[in-house]
UniProtKB/Swiss-Prot annotation:
Quaternary data: Homodimer.
Molecular functions per Gene Ontology: magnesium ion binding; orotate phosphoribosyltransferase activity
SUPFAM superfamilies given in the database record: PRTase-like (SSF53271)
Protein name, UniProt field: Orotate phosphoribosyltransferase
InterPro entries associated with the record: OPRT (IPR023031), Or_phspho_trans_dom (IPR004467), PRibTrfase_dom (IPR000836), PRTase-like (IPR029057)
Top-level class of the enzyme under EC nomenclature: transferase
CDD domains found in the cross-reference section: PRTases_typeI (cd06223)
Gene: pyrE
Residues where 5-phospho-alpha-D-ribose 1-diphosphate binds: R94, K98, H100, E120, D121, L122, I123, S124, T125, G126, G127, S128
Catalytic activity: orotidine 5'-phosphate + diphosphate = orotate + 5-phospho-alpha-D-ribose 1-diphosphate
A biological process term (GO) from this entry: 'de novo' UMP biosynthetic process
PROSITE patterns named among the record's database cross-references: PUR_PYR_PR_TRANSFER
HAMAP family reported for this sequence: PyrE
Lineage summary: Bacteria, Bacillati, Bacillota, Bacilli, Bacillales
Length: 209
């Protein structure tokens, strides 16, 4: 499954690998990879495999789930598709409460004590999805964990999830994608070495040499 999803992301160009022309993240980090999982929605086969994968992941890792929550906005469609396959209720969590109306941060019929799994499309540092999990906890839900399509596998994210005490699982990851890209001829051995070096220390620029 991990390799299949990685190949999907590479084929539809949801993931770009540019070891020699790095992208600049909002945080200022120079990165050899850019991931846009929103593109997966435009490809029915890919979208279906992701929905089935997330549903299976939740059944396997979080069998007690009673509600699926999507992070706004990228996690919403994937949460809806997975919830449909699992025949479970679904809600979504805004990054902050609305400035008008009822001022909701969580949209949907959420019941206190409900066991919830949060779906995110991409995990970089983990900040946004952990904020969503915190909002659900504050609303009285029991957050079982997080399911996502892809993770960069950065140490900072692992530390953040550990500190928050939140379990997380993904359909594929950075290492699997790098291996698939090399096997598929998307990158060279030299590129793969740069990608590995970047992951070890994303804030360093030594991998660019």
């Amino acid at each position: 499954m991990k390799t299949d999803i990685a190949n999907h992301l590479l084929k539809i160009k949801a993931v770009f690998l540019r070891p020699n022309e790095p992208f600049t993240w909002a945080s200022g980090i120079l990165s050899p990879i850019y991931c846009d999982n929103r593109l997966t929605l435009s490809y029915p086969e890919v979208r279906d495999d992701i929905a089935s994968g997330l549903a299976g992941l939740i059944q396997d890792k979080f069998p007690g789930a009673e509600m699926i929550a999507g992070t706004a906005t990228a996690g919403i469609p994937h949460a809806a598709l997975a919830a449909d396959r699992l025949s479970l209720p679904m809600c979504y969590v805004r990054s902050k409460p609305k400035a008008h109306g009822k001022g909701n941060q969580i949209e949907g019929a959420v019941v206190k004590g409900q066991k919830v799994v949060v779906i995110e499309d991409l995990i970089s540092t983990g900040g946004s999805v952990l904020e969503a999990a915190a909002a659900l906890t504050e609303a009285g839900c029991e957050v079982l964990g997080v399911a996502a399509i892809f993770t960069y596998g950065l140490p900072k994210a692992a530390a953040a999830f550990s500190e928050a005490g939140v379990e997380y699982h993904t359909l594929t990851d950075y290492d699997t994608l790098t291996e698939a890209a090399l096997a598929g001829g998307y990158i060279t051995e030299q590129d793969a070495a740069k990608l590995k070096e970047w992951k070890a220390d994303p804030e360093s620029k030594s991998w660019m040499n």
